[in-house]
Design a protein with these regions (language model features):
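Bacterial N-terminal signal peptides that target proteins for export
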Residues: 1-10
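Bacterial N-terminal signal peptides
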Residues: 9-19
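Sec/Tat signal peptide C-region and signal peptidase I cleavage site
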Residues: 21-26
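Short, glycine-/small- and polar/acidic-enriched structural segments
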Residues: 27-159, 164-169, 183-189, 204-208
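Solvent-exposed, polar/charged alpha-helical surfaces in well-ordered, non-transmembrane soluble domains
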Residues: 48, 53-54, 76, 80, ...
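Short, solvent-exposed loop/beta-turn-alpha elements that line the ligand-binding surface or hinge
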Residues: 58, 209-218, 285-295
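Pocket-lining segment of extracytoplasmic ligand-binding domains
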Residues: 92, 166, 171-266
């Protein structure tokens, strides 16, 4: 080795030692398999916003997005392990899955119950109790229906007995009300905003957040964030990254609502302006908080207990359903 080369090598070694060794490799991105619905609902909106803005990559995550055409297939993907997360889902849906042996845990909140509404065009119907003797289009298998039924019972109203309930998905409930086949429809955002825009006679007679707060003191959660236990064990540090990524989506939506609306219109095919209007209404709220916080855990667990007390579900899940670091 020449003196010049030796001097150069010596200098590089000295520099490396002074800087604590060779440069560390960039932190590897963790692959997370994400179930995404092909419907214009909250789940694909979050997925598309995160991907479009590169938010997953900024948090050392790599979303492997897998599309599903129905809610049943969507939940089945995380139940079977085909996906690590559905991004969002109903607390009592995960309660049922956990009690049936699915290794699912709730790591964060994301959407309060304010996105659940009942709409009517009838001037005679002013509140939920006014539906006595009337017809309601609703998805009776949904968590949202459970929430309405629990509140109704507290008001002395039994759905299915005092109110004739017509089984309908949220999209079909919209159609049934428009055709005049029912007196009211139970829907969620963004369908609610689209309905209110298309018919000036529609009025909101029930809001899930307002009703649940009246009943429990908390707004409750329509959607929470799940992760499979095997994913958590495989990449424990990814839990905090996933929550942080979702919080960045929340911040982006709040600070760049017009850009977010344009992305949603292009990718999820919502009419332009609907996403923005739903957010502005205060009904559609993105609120990502770690599920293990005392207030959040208590609110989620209260929903579990009420589902069992109302006999919608047979039993409570084990404590581990709510993740804690």
């Amino acid at each position: 080795m020449t003196r010049t080369k030796l001097t150069a090598v010596t200098a590089l070694v000295a520099l490396a030692l002074a800087s604590g060794g060779p440069p560390a490799r960039a932190q590897e991105r963790v692959k997370i398999r994400v179930a995404a619905l092909t419907l214009p609902v909250f789940n694909p909106i979050i997925v598309h916003l995160m991907k479009e803005k590169g938010i997953d990559a900024r948090h050392q995550l790599d979303m492997d997005v897998r599309a599903y055409p129905s809610i049943a297939a969507f939940y089945a993907a995380v139940a079977t392990g085909e996906a690590d997360t559905t991004v969002v889902g109903g607390p009592t849906v995960f309660q049922k899955m956990r009690t049936e042996g699915v290794p699912i845990r709730i790591v964060a909140t994301i959407v309060p119950q304010s996105d659940l509404v009942i709409l009517t065009a009838s001037p005679a119907i002013q509140s939920l109790v006014d539906l006595k003797g009337k017809t309601l289009a609703a998805d009776m298998g949904s968590q949202q229906y459970q929430a309405v039924a629990i509140y109704g019972r507290a008001k002395g109203l039994t759905l299915g007995t005092d109110v004739t309930v017509v089984q309908a998905s949220f999209a079909l409930a919209r159609t049934q009300l428009a055709a005049g086949r029912v007196d009211a429809a139970m829907v969620i955002e963004p369908i609610a905003t689209m309905m209110l825009k298309e018919n000036a006679q529609y009025r909101m007679i029930f809001n899930g957040g307002v009703a649940w707060r009246e009943l429990t003191g908390e707004e409750g959660w329509d959607l929470v964030v799940p992760l499979r236990e095997d994913f958590i064990k495989r990449a424990p540090a990814a839990v905090a990254r996933w929550i942080a990524a979702l919080q960045e989506v929340q911040a982006f939506v709040k600070q760049n609502v017009d850009e977010a609306d344009a992305i949603v219109a292009r990718t999820v095919k919502l009419p332009p302006g609907i996403f923005k209007e739903a957010l502005a209404s205060g009904r559609w709220v993105v609120d990502v908080r770690p599920a293990w916080g005392a207030r959040e855990r208590k609110s989620i667990w209260d929903m579990f207990e009420r589902a069992v007390a109302a006999k919608y579900l047979e039993k409570l899940p084990d404590d581990a359903i709510i993740y804690a670091p």
